[in-house]
């Protein structure tokens, strides 16, 4: 009880009191952030607290750059959050700072606000989680219209109205290092589970695969060649699994000759993968923020979700 009271004083108590003088709540992550959807969940938790206390939330990924921040503006934009998303509140970052009436958010994840009703490992969403967060996401964490339109057109190029789509997310790279993440299952387990789902549901005619490893991509291409289903993927930067337990994710991989705007494109590619996953009829996934967010975006419309538990 004392610990909960202490936590309340350091968060709701402290920042509720500051609301007397401050109007804007500036969300930042000073350590440079982590994976794309780790940052997304960080922002989501802080947005919910800001709303609760009556602040206008603003995201600062300009003065607090992330792994996806470029050294030069992207389309004239210098705040990496706005590369991909609309403002989370009714003000720009510049307006918030110039007002002088702002407070910096605590530089930590707000687990009590970003894991509501979740269960098991890695805040896996339940239907109650989705019902709680979907309205906030639709209201505050909106993808830029031109990007969502591009994703929509790309989806329509692959999927027709009668297609039933199984979405599969296989996360590799740093998820295999056992450093705070649930260990993923082997790719053969995903393939076997996918086969069973396809055999059970005749309506599945397409399989969308999202993965950060070329090994996984090739394994699925080999397994589902010349079958009744069509496998498709988005173009994205992927790496080869050399068997080493990587301490960094694909978003931190050093590239010898990076393409122009590589960091920005890394974010856009994982965003499109999650967006495609949320459009699918069925989902097969492990524990990761990407699949968690896809489930919340899907708004309880999946016909079936199967989570492949990893190795202990």
Residue ranges and their predicted role:
Residues 3-206, 217:
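Secretory-pathway glycan-assembly enzymes, especially type II membrane glycosyltransferases
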Residues 52, 191-194, 232-236, 308-311:
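Glycine-rich loops and low-complexity Gly/Arg-rich segments
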Residues 51-63, 285-286, 297-312:
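Gly/Pro- and small hydrophobic-enriched strand-loop and loop-to-helix capping segments
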Residues 171, 212, 309-310:
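Cofactor-binding loop segments of dinucleotide-utilizing enzymes, especially the Rossmann-like FAD-
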Residues 205-302, 306:
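Donor-binding and catalytic core of enzymes assembling or modifying cell-surface/extracellular glycoconjugates
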Residues 1-2, 269:
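Short, intrinsically disordered terminal tails adjacent to the first/last structured region
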